[in-house]
């Protein structure tokens, strides 16, 4: 089967990593995959997709975004040429800005078998009527990355499996998967009494709650001198966070790693005992399952898909969104109870297997075979 995957950008984000997982799953399933990037891309990410066995077509020669009617015409011409040359059996659209436009264009150009995946919950959309129209009249399957997200879009949710009944129009949940560079630990993680490392592995942006991390760490540092903070990532909040650390007198206890290659992340997770995810919006929480796979105890905000991924009190802890005091309280409960921390870590290692690449690949390959 020949499959066209379309995506607005190929940069360094969770959506690109999960779409790369999709490519790997389909190629391993014996399918021919063409990935079309409309706008921005990095040569490194394009190379990752090519190394996974897909053909990559970047429509924008300058890696720039084109808006308005010019953008619509640009997409129409690009997609028309690809459909003429490649003749795919199925198109799989990653639903991000420019949203439904590529879906309408593919339908206009005669593409009937269309799958759409949205990588967020419905809270970022002011109006869902367009998405409901797309799901009911334009695509065969609309997939979401958590059941909470699916319910927020459509009012009901179903986790897809091979026994799921397919209708003419469908919506399901298929969970994201661990990337190939992160493996589930076979041995239990050990926790030291002498030094405890809190960590963030994230884009350093306000939407990820990064402005809350240093204030929370500074409050804890006053009582727990053994703790340190490892910051992996970069973004617009980095300078702000560094200024906070200096102002609050904790900069000597913070290690700034900057943006890291995917291949380096596993060893960095292994240095983290308690992984912080104070996001203001989170469709799934890929960082959470990556951390759990390495035995980290995740402390995350109660927002978006995180409560579904981080089972509160079972494999990690949740705190109220934008609440530094509650975040501090949850971390403190771990620092005060080493036995509980170890148990949550062990539970996480068992629990995270449901997000394995094998399960993800089986689900999507089965879905493709059934709708073609």
Could you say what each language-model-derived stretch is?
Residues 4, 190-208, 214-217:
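Conserved donor-binding/catalytic core segment of Leloir-type glycosyltransferases
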Residues 5-13, 17-73, 162-167:
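N-terminal strand-loop element at the rim of the active site
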Residues 57, 139-185:
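Donor nucleotide-sugar binding/catalytic pocket of nucleotide-sugar-dependent glycosyltransferases
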Residues 83, 259-260, 267-272:
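Short alpha-helical donor nucleotide-sugar binding micro-motif in glycosyltransferases
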Residues 93-99:
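Short His-centered aromatic/hydrophobic patch
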Residues 280:
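Aromatic "clamp/platform" in nucleotide-sugar-dependent glycosyltransferases that forms part
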Residues 297-300, 310:
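Short hydrophobic beta-strand element within catalytic cores of glycosyltransferases
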Residues 312-313, 317-324, 333-338:
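Conserved acidic donor-binding segment of nucleotide-sugar-dependent glycosyltransferases
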